[in-house]
């Protein structure tokens, strides 16, 4: 069975997080047929650039598409998906608006690397670079979300108002707005638009 056929039979999964909690999925989100097919073909295409066999990649790696459509799931349930991929080599494929979040998860969990889809001149080389284990902290191309900003993003995603967040975080409402504004600058978008 080929790499592509392994993936093509699975991309009909309807529930994004249901798919994520299954340990037999290697490309999240498989319900995004274009991403799924494109990444599968790309990995086969870069076979000569990577040191590992395609079978080892299929078995040991998880490739996660951090796009604006799935971002709220990843923000609201980051503890769940991070524990679901424990023991796997996680590669985040980050769109422009999710780069700062990808960097946050890279710094704060066991992520192998980040492929910056929007900045890459040659995504094949970027992907091979990460798969081969060469991605390092020095390769981070942008700011990351801070822990405090992430807490405020999570609470905002849950529908909490700044006043409630300020009470929980034991800070002023002005501080909440400042952290939110800083996070939005790093994400190139208003938080509420990303988590709808």
UniProtKB/Swiss-Prot annotation:
Pfam families: GerE
InterPro entries found in the cross-reference section: Sig_transdc_resp-reg_C-effctor (IPR016032), Tscrpt_reg_LuxR_C (IPR000792), WH-like_DNA-bd_sf (IPR036388)
Domain HTH luxR-type: 138-196
Protein keywords: Activator, Cytoplasm, DNA-binding, Transcription, Transcription regulation
Inducing factors: Negatively regulated by H-NS. Positively autoregulated. Also positively regulated by IHF.
DNA-binding span(s): 162-181
Name the record gives this protein: HTH-type transcriptional regulator EcpR
Organism, scientific name: Escherichia coli (strain 55989 / EAEC)
Lineage, uppermost ranks: Bacteria, Pseudomonadati, Pseudomonadota, Gammaproteobacteria, Enterobacterales
Protein's gene: ecpR
């Amino acid at each position: 069975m080929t790499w592509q056929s392994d993936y093509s039979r699975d991309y009909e999964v309807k529930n994004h997080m249901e798919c994520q909690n299954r340990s037999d999925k290697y490309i999240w989100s498989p319900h995004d047929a274009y991403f799924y097919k494109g990444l599968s073909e790309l990995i086969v295409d870069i076979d000569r650039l990577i040191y590992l066999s395609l079978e080892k990649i299929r078995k040991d790696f998880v490739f996660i598409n951090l796009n604006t459509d799935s971002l709220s799931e990843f923000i609201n349930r980051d503890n769940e998906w991070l524990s679901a991929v424990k023991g796997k080599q996680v590669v985040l494929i980050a769109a422009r608006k999710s780069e700062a979040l990808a960097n946050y998860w890279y710094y704060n969990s066991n992520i192998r690397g980040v492929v910056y889809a929007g900045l890459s001149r040659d995504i094949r080389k970027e992907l091979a670079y990460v798969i081969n284990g060469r991605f390092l902290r020095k390769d981070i191309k942008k700011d990351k979300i801070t822990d405090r900003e992430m807490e405020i993003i999570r609470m905002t995603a849950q529908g909490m108002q700044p006043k409630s967040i300020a009470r929980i975080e034991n800070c002023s409402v002005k501080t909440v707005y400042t952290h939110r504004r800083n996070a939005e600058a790093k994400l190139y978008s208003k938080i509420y638009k990303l988590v709808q």
